[in-house]
Each structure stands twice: as structure tokens, then as C-alpha cells.
Amino acid sequence: MRYTRKDYETFLSTELETQMREYARLVETKAIVLKERGDVFVGRFIKLQENGMVVFKVRVNDNMPRKNTFWTASYFINEMGSYKNWGELSWAELRKQYQRDCSEALCAWLSKSEDSNFCLVGIKNISVEFAQILEKERPIIAFGPSDPPLEYLMNLIAIVRDTNCAVTKQILDYEPSESNNWNPTKVESKEDLNTLLAQKLQVNNCIAIQGPPGTGKTYRMAALSAELLRQGKSVLVTALTNQALIELVKKKDLKDFLDAQKVTKTSLTVDESKELPKLQPNKKNLCNAAPGYLSLATFYLSSAWAKDAIEIPFDYVIMDEASQALYPMIAASVKLGNKIIWIGDQNQLPPIVLTGDDVINRYDWGGIVKGFNTLCTNFSYPSYMLKDTFRLTERGAACTGIFYNNDLNSVSKVQTIKSSIDCLNKNGWPTFLGMDLEPGDKTPTLAISSIIDLVEEILSEDKDAKIAVLSKFRPTVRQIQKQFILQSKKSEIPENVKIETVDRVQGLTVDYCIFFIPNASLKYSLEKELFNVATSRAKYCTIIVADKSLMGKDMEEEVRKYLLKSQDDKFVAFNSTKNITAGNVSVNVLGKIDLSKFEKKRKEIVEGKENIYIIDTNVFVNCPNIIDRIGHKYKVIIPAKVLEELDKLKLKNNIDKNALNTAARNINLAFTKQFSKMEDADISLLPVGFDKNNPDCQILSVALKYKGENPIILTSDNILQTRAKGLGITTISLTDFLRQLR
């Protein structure tokens, strides 16, 4: 078998521990520091609207929350309502000692206030009890980190531990296929998918469906659910997000069942019930299978039902967003239904996990993370691919089709764009806008301002145009949202403008999409699945904003081909062979040689991570040209403390002044050419017991900022090396570093 039960449990336990550790690190940080970083914000209650939305007033000069982000709203007693009194208390200590009440919260919108020093924030998902306190006392509320979904992982651990369950054995204990079994039947939009599925399900219990962007996955699943309900079947639709469930139940095929109060949903919120008053709450979130009824539940709750199930409760289970399910969740679904339909897209985003890529690669856990892909490539269940996209133009489908073996076909009624805006391709091609972006800067002011100007220009031409502004990074999105409120002529971010991270928009359809790629940690923005999601949202045009030099960066072949198309073939890809002649001489070019293959592999480098060198003071003293020796392939960070120490060394008599001057010139040149940058210490990241005034500890705190990547402290200081290794930070001495370059 590919994975033992111990393998599954070890991965899930590792992810559980990682989430707990990251959450603990966050909440044990001083609350005032979290506020300065944007991980906590405070607002004064203004009003409770009829639709269940709660409005708060927040200072503009604070870090405002991103739209559609989850928080824990905490009401602190007495003087602790003011952040100025938080002192040295951590967020956890504040909640433990001073919290009177709390509620889950979701930031739904941002808006300007009559007072230019403040903005308004709309919050939903507030509990009824908490809302009553707000209306009565009108307090200041602090919003902090939301709790991680630990119960979901614990449910999956219980499922993989159960070796006696016959139905999960066929999924969990599979033998890997020697070849890729994924060869789906292509389904056109005019074909009756329900009839095809009904025929296959007579002799098969499971079916897998791939739904590329805009192919009508949700519409098809709503139609299938309605047909099954008419047959008197009990049906469960489960998905990762509540939003996916709400989008499904809003489809017209389910209206009669909604009106008949035959559709229930777990964890129904006030705003959801306002939007869909006939949707019934599953008040205790218990498994409620019943003939002719549709149950809606997220993975977090359906996994609990699967854990506790002794007999299979539902006739049919439809797993939407299956590509966002961990493989044990795929197994959990077969405990819930006699017939299973998985629908997802293995070329879009997999589940988000906090366990590092290096750990996942080391233990070969990729197949557990990308569960739907594992299912599709190793099992020979009947499979289908929806090949007609209603969203994309012919040219848009040609670009996105690169990710689908060019099998994507456009049936959109829109093929050309009626716009006078110069940068929008009138024929539906994606557009590439190259700018000069500073390396390492995730919130470049000029680029963000230009993006907002473009959004305003589109809205001035069509005020109802649906626009998405997407980026990989949360700080980028937070800054764009904030600047839109401050810079735009609008009083708030309109409902038809969505500014969000890519991982939160799978399934979104808009008219125009602007995908902003900051010149920082590029490999994450250019990751194939994420790039595909970001560039396949728009019906009319996708605009990619990035650094001019982007095409010179390393990226996967499909992404490069897409970008080449987006630049109207200004760049071309060579064929596998090319003939060059000069006079009587002829040469066949068969390919290219990657010279990096002949370089010695550095032992401190980790593949799949961004490798970042943090250089200690003693290294510059002994090797002034160290930045050149590292090379421009890797990011180099100079802690501000190092520059301060180098400056002080000039006052000593027994120091090589020429070496210091050379080091200073090289650092200045590296800063000018953007090969390197300076960073201040963040002593809040240091563990308890570390001397926050110690220079070594301050240098160490710079490395801790990049703990999610592979920070490498280059130092000859044995004590600093020991401290770094104790915190899991890679270190290498100057001697060892230079030796491996020989």
C-alpha cells in the first residue's frame, strides 16, 4: 500500500501540532504588538443593522482588517477596553484575565466614515447573545486571531485509526497505480450529465468529476441534487466552505425544495437566514439524513458525522470542492453515503496546510495533502471532465486550456469586449502590465495606486462591472483594501469589487480580474494551481500586473506558456530543434544546457523553499565581498544591528579599516542594485528567556521573521549558531560556506 495508517496519522498529528504551535505563538505575543502588525484591531460599536450586520468604527491609521477574514471578537472589562492599557499582556493573557464575552466574527465590508480619521467595518457571524450585549452597552471591541479548525483534524485522525471499517479500507489502503489512471470522458454543456451519472451509478458506487473554471460545477450539482430529491433520496452535499454550500442552494433547481423547507444547513448564521429565509437550520449540527431531504454541511462537521457513523446514513453524498479535501476526508465521505460523487479540479488549489513543504516532501505526504488528485490518478472509478466553459472567451479558454491539455472549449456568449480602456485586450486575451517593482516589497505604493486607478477607470465606464483584485499575500490585499478606501472616490469598497487573496476566491466569476504579483517570493504567486485560479475568474479580461522582468524568473512550463500568450506572443518558445546556418556551416540546436546542474549543491539550501541568507557582523569583517560570494540567486538580508555594529567597529584600533570600508561599499552597492536589503529586529518573536537587548538575539529575531521559509544565518559565532539551531534555524559558518564553493 502507498500509505500505512501510521503514515496518515503522523501527517495529521504533525499538521495538528503545527496549527496549535502557530496559534500559541500568535496568541502568546504581546497584544499591542499584534495590533501594530494587523493581527488585532479594535473598533467601537456603532449599530446593529436589520440584516444582522454589526457596524464598528476603526481608526484609519491602524491596520484595518481584510474583507472576508475570520476573527474572534472579544469584549474586555473595565479599562482593558482601551488598547492603551494592555501593557505587556499577551493576547492569550488578555482573554483569560479580562474577557467578559466573545463571538466568532467575519469582516464583511469596509467603508469611509464621516470622520476622516476613521473608517467603518461591517461584521457578520456575530452570535445573538453577543449582539444583545453590543446594543445594550455600545462598547469598544477587540478583534483577534480566530481559533484553528483542530476538531476537523482530530476527526480525521479517528477515522484513519479505525482499521475495522470496511468502506474506508478501499480508499486508505490502496495500492498505488503504476500509471496515471485519470482519463475522464469529456462532457459537453449540451449533454445530460444526470442521465450519464444515473447509468454509471447503477453499477458503480463512486464517480469522480473534474470541473475546470466556469464549466458550471455548482449548477450541475444543484440539478443532480434536485433530481435525487425528486426520487425520494436522502442527500448530503459537503464542501470546505459555507459559501460554496450557500451558492449551491441558491440555484433555481433547488427552489421548490427550499420553499418546502426540505433543505437544512449546519451552523446557519443570522445573515445566511436573512438571505435565504426558507433555509432550515440544523440546530444541533447532528447528522439528519431523511428521505427527500437535502443536508448541507462543511467538511468540519461532516467529518464528525463520519467519525461517529456506525451505519451509512445517506443514500447519496456529493462532495463539492473535492480538490480542497485532504485524502482522509475523501475516505470519510464513503462512510456517509451509499453512492458518492466527488467533484473538484486537481488543477486548482489543494488544501491549505501549515506543515512546511520541506517536511511534506521529506516524508512523501504530498499524496495525502492533494487528496482528490491521489484519488483520480490511482483509482479507475468512472470519471468525467466538464469541457465547456461558460465563463471564458475563446481566447481566455485557449490560455486557461494550457492547464487542461488544451481540452477546454468556450461556449460563452461574450467573445469581444466593448471598452475604450487601452490596457484591456478587446479580443478577450489576458493582458500583461509590466512595471518596475522593488524586490521584496509586497505593498508597493505606486503599483497599488495604479491598480486602484484602473479599477476606477473600469467602473467609470461601467459602474456595474464586477471586478476582482487578487494577490497571493495577505499584507498586499490588506494594503490594497485600505488604500482603496482612502484613495478611491467611493465611500466604501462596492459590492461589485472584490479585493482578496487567491486562496479565498475559488469558484468566483467576475467581468474583470486584476492579478497583482508583487516582486517578492515570486515562486508562490507563480505556483501552477494558484496561478490557474487567479487567471481564470474573468468573463471579459484578466490583467496581470507584475515586474517587467517576470519572464526571466523560474516558473512551471504551463505558467510560462500562459504568460507568453498574455503578452501577445512578444516572446516565443523555441521548438525542440532549430537549424542555424551561416554560409556552408549548419548547426542543429537540440536544446539548452542548464549550467546550474554543474554547480556544487550547498548543504544549507532547501529545495522548494525560499532560501534567505542573514549575515552576521563577523562575516563581513573576515569576508567583505560575501554578498557576491553568495550570488544573486538567493535573497540576502542585513540586520540593522549588523550595520550598527560595523559602524562601531570603525572606532577600534585593532580592526582592518580597509576591510570594513570594502564591506560598507559592497553593502551599499547591493542595496542600490536591490540584491540585498536591511531589516529591523522584531524582538516579539523571541522565545521567553532570550535577552531582547542582546545583539545576537536581535539578529536571530530577523531570521525568525522568515521561519516559514529557509532562513540561513551565516555566522562564525558559536553561541549564535547554537541558539539558532535550538530554534530550528539553519546556520553555516563562513569557513564551511567558503569551503563548499571551492
Feature roles, as predicted:
Residues 256-301, 500-501:
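Inter-Walker segment of RecA-like/P-loop motor cores
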Residues 231, 239-243, 300-319, 323-612, ...:
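Conserved helicase motor core of SF1/SF2 NTP-dependent helicases
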Residues 217:
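Conserved lysine of the Walker
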Residues 243-273, 483-491:
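Conserved helix-turn-beta segment of the N-terminal RecA-like "Helicase ATP-binding" lobe
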Residues 209, 237:
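Hydrophobic anchor at the beta1->P-loop junction of P-loop NTPases
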Residues 2-7, 11, 61-202, 258-266, ...:
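Pre-ATPase regulatory/linker segments immediately N-terminal to the P-loop/RecA-like helicase/translocase core
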Residues 220, 224:
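Hydrophobic positions on the alpha1 helix immediately C-terminal to the Walker A/P-loop
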Residues 1-88, 470-478, 482-485:
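Accessory interdomain/linker segments of ATP-dependent helicases and helicase-like nucleic-acid enzymes
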